[in-house]
Curated annotation (Swiss-Prot):
Residues 156-394 form the Radical SAM core domain. Monomer. The keyword Repressor does not apply. This is tRNA-2-methylthio-N(6)-dimethylallyladenosine synthase. InterPro entries: Elp3/MiaA/NifB-like_rSAM, Methylthiotransferase, Methylthiotransferase_CS, Methylthiotransferase_N, Methylthiotransferase_N_sf, MiaB_methiolase, rSAM, rSAM_horseshoe. The gene is miaB. Catalyzes the methylthiolation of N6-(dimethylallyl)adenosine (i(6)A), leading to the formation of 2-methylthio-N6-(dimethylallyl)adenosine (ms(2)i(6)A) at position 37 in tRNAs that read codons beginning with uridine.
């Protein structure tokens, strides 16, 4: 950990008074979960949530570095806050997350107004780090460390659906990905600690949990113990069986899965366990074996298709979503077309797409066969058009179906509708009946007859 005494021109008043805070989160679900935990820590310290970042006494950016445009957004936000700090010296400015881990002390040189730079492994240490800031220091916390148990009381954004981290970090070495260098090695939480957190959520009337990990089906590889069959004693499959009996929790989801570890045993567990939802997010990244090899993904298209076939053999209506990268270095037109072909063949419910973006300290970033921005833009547009077309077609299967929808709130764009999600994770809007006395609470499950399908959402009416 680096601790520096601030120079006079950027020194914050030496004052431990709290005030208000604002957190802006960039990136993935893991970052969202981390932000909830940091918000909980700040409120435990006495901070209150500001109505906007311009009124906050502490501004925290929880950052992403998976693509360059995410980084540039952060620097744009920081520039505005740096100017504000010269007018409001007591402002505390914090950068957390993957960009903080990647850049470390160099962030202080680029933005000397910063008070604290902290990587993802230090989320649970926020209070101690801010204590050092209150003593008049600039602090950089990016050293690799054992992640302290997740005992913070998160300030959950939802009162119904809760994130639960079960494994931190990533041991994979995909040639394009910066995550292992910024999130560190895999660290699995112990099953009893995970179950205790889920029980706390159930006690607080949460109805749905999503288990989180960079490669969630790698859970338990670093934990001790093996079975007499020679497999690891604590796997994601074992964890699902272990937590399934927590009373009050109705739905269990997990993300993100790696095809390399997605086993038949896991699929069988998802089929047998009533609370586990029929929604699987399994990135394929490319539809071409040679590109997958260059990406160091560790599986073939044949293996990926077998996973999907095994899921659909037991759960034919399961929702399958994925991630894909186009314009990877050296990707030919034919290799790119293989990706489009896979999307059409599988029939994904949704695919998160991105054009390849070179990231620091990754092998692919220095390859000489980078594709042009024009090719990236064209391929990204074409794949997005196909994804939307496929998703629209897939959603047609819901028309006239009666689906169970977990109510999450009112539609913010239409107060005459409530919204929630199906077990297959389809966002669903439901017209509030006017001709009957219909009382509902957040977390209720209602039966909805679907009468309209768009690419990424459904609309329906209450089925009595």
């Amino acid at each position: 950990m680096l601790t520096k005494t601030k120079s006079d021109e950027i020194k914050t008043q030496k004052d431990s008074t709290t005030g208000s805070y604002w957190i802006t989160t960039f990136g993935c679900q893991m970052n969202k979960a981390d932000s909830e935990r940091m918000a909980g820590t700040l409120e435990k310290m006495g901070y209150t949530r500001a109505d906007n970042e311009l009124n906050a006494d502490l501004v925290l950016y929880n950052t992403c570095t998976i693509r360059d445009n995410a980084e540039q957004k952060v620097y744009s936000f920081l520039g505005r806050q740096a100017k504000r700090k010269h007018k409001t010296p007591r402002l505390k400015l914090v950068v957390a997350g993957c960009l903080a881990q990647q850049e470390g002390e160099s962030l202080l040189r680029r933005v000397p107004e910063l008070d604290l730079v902290m990587g993802p492994q230090h989320v649970n240490n926020l209070e101690n780090l801010l204590g050092k800031v209150d003593l008049g220091n600039q602090v950089v916390a990016t050293e690799e460390t054992f992640i302290s148990e997740d005992i913070t009381s998160a300030r959950r954004e939802s009162s119904i659906c809760g994130w639960v981290n079960i494994i931190y970090g990533c041991n994979e070495r995909c040639s394009y990905c910066v995550v292992p260098s910024v999130r560190g090695k895999e660290q699995s939480r112990y099953p009893n600690a995970i179950k205790s957190e889920i029980q706390k959520l159930a006690d607080d009337n949460f109805k749905e949990i999503t288990l989180l990990g960079q490669n969630i089906d790698a859970y338990g590889r670093d934990l001790p113990g093996t079975t007499k069959e020679g497999r690891k004693e604590n796997t994601l499959t074992d964890l699902l069986y272990y937590i399934h009996d927590v009373k009050g929790i109705r739905r269990i989801r997990f993300a993100t899965s790696h095809p390399r570890y997605f086993s038949k045993r896991l699929i069988q567990a998802c089929y047998e366990l009533d609370k586990v939802c029929e929604h699987f997010h399994i990135p394929f990244q490319s539809g071409n074996d040679e590109i997958l090899k260059q990406m160091s993904r560790g599986y073939s298209i044949k293996k990926y298709k077998n996973i999907i076939e095994n899921i659909r053999s037991l759960m034919p209506d399961a929702s399958i979503t994925a991630d894909a990268i186009v314009a990877f270095p050296g990707e030919t037109e034919k290799q790119y077309q293989d990706t489009l072909k896979l999307i059409s063949e599988i029939g994904f419910d949704q695919v998160n797409t991105a054009a390849y973006s070179a990231r620091p300290n990754t092998p692919a970033a220095v390859w000489t066969n980078q594709l042009s921005e024009e090719v990236k833009k064209a391929r990204l547009q074409e794949i997005n058009d196909l994804v939307e077309k496929t998703a629209r077609s897939r959603n047609q299967r819901y028309i006239d179906n009666i689906e169970s929808v977990l109510i999450e709130g009112l539609n913010p764009k239409n107060s005459s509708q409530i919204m929630g999600r199906t077990r297959t994770n389809r966002l669903t809007f439901v017209e509030i009946p006017k001709n009957i006395n219909f009382n509902f609470s957040l977390g209720d499950e209602i039966n909805v007859r679907i009468n309209e399908a768009r690419p990424f959402s459904l609309t329906g009416e209450l089925s009595l």
